[in-house]
UniProtKB/Swiss-Prot annotation:
The keyword Nucleotide-binding applies. It is an enzyme of class 2 (transferase). Belongs to the polyphosphate kinase 1 (PPK1) family. The gene is ppk. This is Polyphosphate kinase.
Length: 736
């Protein structure tokens, strides 16, 4: 049964069955994997968005390909493992692992085909813009001579020709390894031989040829094309009978034993095993001779349904390298983040700025430097006595790590929770942990069974004969690089209650002291799920008693069945539910009798939406100064609520509360230029401004308007709420 049939059946059920039956059955959920593929389709659609410069469109295409690679490494690998183990347990939406895999393969086939079609179109747009991708037949004599010289000096020394025969068995190919397969024949006697050339991973995929000096035209050739021109240099005495490229993806899930004496060594061993995970996808250039393809497939023990013929370019995730060409006119205009004005008002003293009033910093519109500055100032301030920090992901040469090391070397008490289980950052985190330990930092690794995903810093400072606790908590990682492109929130406060709560969270992580006396925050896996359900059910009760009831939630993924069912119940009670979900959404919006009052949108644009914001009207509707407003590191997924340490932090200060609710959330709900409306079948359609309504772009808005918790006086006439009211007045005047 294909995906269209499944959707048609589900739509028919939604039309003919009572809502009570739908609510009780698996039909009320959208399949998680198919929902993710719908999300990646939205990312891919940005590569055909004519409003984006062409190199940004190439970047979106590359991102969609990279996303798909990771999806296979983790999600598809997990489903295949279930099938191998004979597991037939159904997903919440009622599909067995085998049924899910069939639907995934069908959807991926269409997605991958569309990626290639879009790439062919983009090549034409690039050519029209003066960026030409060359085949071997396209180069001039002079260019071929230059390529040969470049090949001999910069590529040839990195290549190892690998003959395959009884004395030279088929070599190990790493995950994402790009390889040229060859059918050769010896010139002297015609004796056949198969061979491989693995493309080196640490050099650029695209080679830029010298310009002619007369115009801006950029001429580019791929590494594999250049290598193919000079295969004779690698296999002298042989001629090529057939060739083709292939690329593999391996299972990248880590298997961790529950009993371990040394967690670091355990992870080092597991990482070595992961490099040799089984092949789950083999992409093959469709021009490769069948005999050669079968030879490679058997050597890699890839099943027939794991082999994908590609009529186009392999490793599309590497297309982002093309954006390095010096053509700023073909990219987004660079954006320089603002620095919070209140910190400037205090001469850069971050502690003085926080003492004056709580502060929300909205990344990437406001600089992540203020987070780095918070820790650097703490490291150098003689009155700071202790620092505690969680690290889930950070950047190479991280200023966060340097600040913690500097603080320890200055004699301060520094504790760092380094999460070894951060997927694909495990090796980097082991390295950071050892660097920090050498500097004198007390490094802990949290729980074996739980990932610590909370974003939390705590600084204890001696002030006026007593100790003051300053905290930073946020929705994003302590990663200065991703903070330039991810939308996230950083919250700074010296509120003593939140300071005590943060200290209890750290005690929980470092000493297993379960925080039963937390006052304002909520922590998973202990109280976060309970807190969310209490608020959702509270709004349901308000609606049933005729009071205003509203829920606004912004997150990356909505998967948890219990949370979804609570939202369905709220909708049936009459609660207005507005959801902004960037990625996976297993909730079906707009189903009569089930989710009539739930609207779901997804924002895909220049920046990656990453912040989690949870707002509840509290009996007053939304927006309201009396609403309950939180930010969090947690999405609404079982893993976040039950298998991770996460923090849900309330916005208690009125200015911060207003900024998050009435500026940030309202702007996200108002966006029409980058938003997609999710439909009951799990697909989505691009939103458009209503007739007479001015289009609104949330990213452009925040790039050009200051935040409330900086100083924000200039915001009063241009806030999203004010703009909304103005538009409503104009529509009212037009209709009258």
């Amino acid at each position: 049964m294909d995906s269209e049939q499944v959707i048609a059946i589900e739509e028919k059920k939604g039309e003919t069955e009572p809502a009570s039956m739908i609510a009780a059955g698996p039909e009320r959920f959208i399949n998680r994997e198919l929902s993710w593929l719908h999300f990646n389709r939205r990312v891919l659609e940005e590569s055909v968005n004519p409003h984006h410069p062409v190199l940004e469109r190439v970047r979106f295409l590359s991102i969609s390909a990279n996303n798909l690679d990771e999806f296979f490494m983790v999600r598809v690998a997990g489903i295949k493992a279930q099938i191998r183990e004979g597991i037939t347990e159904r997903s919440p939406d009622g599909l067995t692992p085998s049924e899910q895999l069939g639907l995934i393969n069908e959807a991926v086939s269409k997605l991958a085909s569309d990626q290639q079609s879009i790439w062919r179109d983009l090549r034409g747009v690039l050519a029209d813009s003066g960026i030409l991708l060359l085949d071997g037949k396209d180069v001039t004599k002079a260019e071929r001579a230059w390529i040969e010289d470049h090949f001999l000096h910069n590529i040839f020394p990195l290549l190892t020709p690998l003959a395959i025969d009884p004395a030279h068995p088929f070599p190990f190919i790493p995950s994402l390894g790009f390889t040229i397969g060859l059918q050769l024949a010896r010139v002297s006697d015609g004796r056949p031989m198969n061979a491989l050339i693995r493309m080196p991973a640490r050099i650029d995929r695209f080679i830029r040829l010298p310009g002619n000096g007369r115009d801006q035209t950029v001429r580019v050739m791929t590494l594999e094309q250049a290598t193919s021109l000079f295969i004779g240099r690698l296999f002298p005495g042989y001629h090529v009978k057939g060739q083709g490229s292939f690329r593999i993806i391996r299972d990248s899930e880590l298997e961790i034993e529950e009993e371990a004496e040394d967690l670091v060594r355990l992870f080092e061993t597991a990482l070595k095993r992961r490099r040799r995970g089984s092949v789950i996808r083999m992409e093959v250039d469709s021009s490769m001779p069948e005999e050669l393809r079968v030879f490679v497939q058997r050597a890699l023990t890839a099943a027939d349904d794991e082999v994908f013929l590609v009529d186009g370019v392999l490793a599309m995730n590497e297309l982002s390298q093309l954006t390095r060409v010096d053509r700023p006119d073909l990219e987004f205009v660079p954006y320089v983040p603002r620095h919070p004005e209140r910190v400037r008002d205090h001469g850069g003293d971050i502690f003085a700025a926080i003492r004056q009033k709580d502060l929300i910093v909205h990344h990437p519109y406001e600089s992540f430097d203020v987070v780095v500055q918070f820790l650097q100032q703490a490291a150098r301030d003689p009155d700071v006595v202790a620092i505690k920090q969680t690290l889930y992901r950070t950047s190479n040469n991280s200023p966060i790590v340097r600040a913690l090391a500097e603080a320890a070397e200055a004699g301060k008490s520094v504790t760092a929770l380094v999460e070894l289980k951060a997927r694909f950052d495990e090796e980097a985190n082991i390295r950071w942990a050892r660097d920090l330990e050498r500097a004198g930092v007390q490094v802990v690794y949290g729980f074996l069974q739980l990932k610590t995903h909370a974003k939390l810093s705590l600084v204890v400072r001696r002030e006026g004969g007593s100790l003051t606790t300053y905290i930073h908590t946020g929705t994003g990682n302590y990663h200065p690089v991703t903070a330039r492109i991810y939308t996230d929130l950083s919250y700074f406060t010296s509120d003593p209650i939140l300071g005590r709560d943060a200290a209890r969270v750290f005690n929980y992580i470092t000493g297993y002291a379960e925080p039963s006396d937390i006052e304002k925050m909520a922590v998973s896996p202990i109280t976060l799920r309970k807190t969310m359900l209490e608020h959702i059910r509270g709004e349901t009760a308000f609606a049933k008693h005729g009071k205003p009831a509203a829920i606004w939630l912004k997150m990356n993924a909505l998967v948890d069945p219990e949370i979804i069912d609570a939202l369905y119940e709220a909708s049936r009670a009459g609660v207005s539910v507005e959801l902004v979900v960037r990625g996976i959404c297993c909730l079906r919006p707009g189903v009569p009798g089930l989710s009539d009052n739930i609207r779901v949108k997804s924002i895909i644009g220049r920046f990656l939406e990453h912040g989690r914001i949870y707002c509840f009207g509290n009996g007053y509707g939304l927006p309201s100064a009396k609403a309950a407003v939180y930010i969090s590191s947690a999405d609404m997924m079982p893993r976040n609520l039950d298998r991770r340490v996460e923090v849900l932090c309330p916005m208690l200060n009125p200015t911060v509360h207003q900024q998050v609710l009435e500026q940030i959330m309202v702007a996200n709900l108002k966006d029409t230029e980058q938003s997609w409306r999710l439909l009951p079948d799990g697909s989505s359609t691009r939103m458009k401004a209503a007739k007479g309504e001015e289009p609104f772009n949330v990213h452009n808005y925040f790039m050009t308007n200051p935040s409330l918790s900086g100083r924000g006086k200039s915001l009063q006439e241009s806030s999203p709420r004010r703009l909304t009211r103005r538009a409503e007045r104009q529509q009212s005047q037009q209709s009258s």
